Each structure stands twice: as C-alpha cells, then as structure tokens.
Amino acid sequence: MSLIKAIITPVTPFQQNAPILFCEDTKKCAFVDPGGDLDILLGAAKDNNLIPEKILLTHGHIDHAGGASELASMLSIEIEGPHKEDTFLLDSLESQGNMFGFQARNCIPNRWLQDGDEVTIGNETLQVYFCPGHTPGHIIFFHAESNLAAVGDVLFQGSIGRTALPGGNHQ
C-alpha cells in the first residue's frame, strides 16, 4: 500500500500552510493552496525529488490561491478546486493582492470540485468534501489510508476557521 505524505510549507506574510502532498510510490505531487512564495514551494519539491502533477485549491482567498495561476503556467499543470461557489473570490485575486501587497493573478480552475468527487496524486486517490463556512466554496481533501487531510482554513490550531469574512457563514 502506498501512502500520501505531506511537506508542510508556510508561505506568504500570513504564514499559512501550503502543503505539498505526494505519492510515496511515484513521487508525483500536488501543491495545495499555493498562496505565494512559489520559489519556496518549488525548492521544497525539488529538495525532495518530487514531480509536480497538479495544484489543489481548498478555497479562493489570496493567501491560499494567489500563486496558483502563476505556478500552473510555470509548470504546465492543472488546477483542481475549489467548489464553484468561490468563483467570486478567484475572480478577485488581483484586487485582493492589491489590498495586501501581494502579486496575484485571477484564477480559473481546470476542474471545479464538489462533495463526493475524487482527485488523484500519483497512484493515490483522495476524497473531496464540501465544507462551506470559511468561504461558500471551501472544500477539503482526505486520504483515508494515510489518515491525512488538507483542510485549508476550515480548522485553525485550536479552533474553527474564521467565518466573518465576505461569503462566510458560521452555520
């Protein structure tokens, strides 16, 4: 049985985690929520001899999606996720970037995801769960065999993610 492993890499001035998930067998990887600092993410992948396969987005905030379009262009890889309810956020990444001093390009995923979908990394399959609240289109990725989840901002250390942002809902 192969496992999915994670390299946790904090990026952006917000220091949000941008995990690099990879298949132990194939060394193929997915960049999850590449908000920025792409040189750091690419360096971590190279240092671990990983083969970039795709980008996975949990939601459309600047610190999670701000570098996705640029990274996809640089590596000729596709973007999967989030749920289409976050379209308004992905369409405003440039303006979000201007507010926070980030360089960002608006983003259109190659594939929108919804509850029950599956995504692959190498030989492994992860389940997609729709978890709105932090944003209307927030999703998470779960690999049961590895007991590993990439949850974006649904959970913070010691609490739930913020829900008082545009489109958020505490319910």
Predicted regions: what they are:
Residues 21, 33, 59, 71, ...:
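Divalent metal-coordination and catalytic microenvironments
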Residues 18, 41, 67, 91, ...:
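Short, function-defining helix-loop hinge/capping sites that tune catalysis or transport
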Residues 29, 36-120:
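Active-site HxH/HxHxD metal-binding segment of metal-dependent hydrolases
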Residues 14, 61-64, 166:
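Alpha-helix N-cap/loop-to-helix initiation residues
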Residues 95-96, 118, 124-171:
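Metallo-beta-lactamase
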Residues 2-48, 140-152:
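Conserved beta-strand hairpin/beta-sheet module of binuclear metal-dependent hydrolase folds
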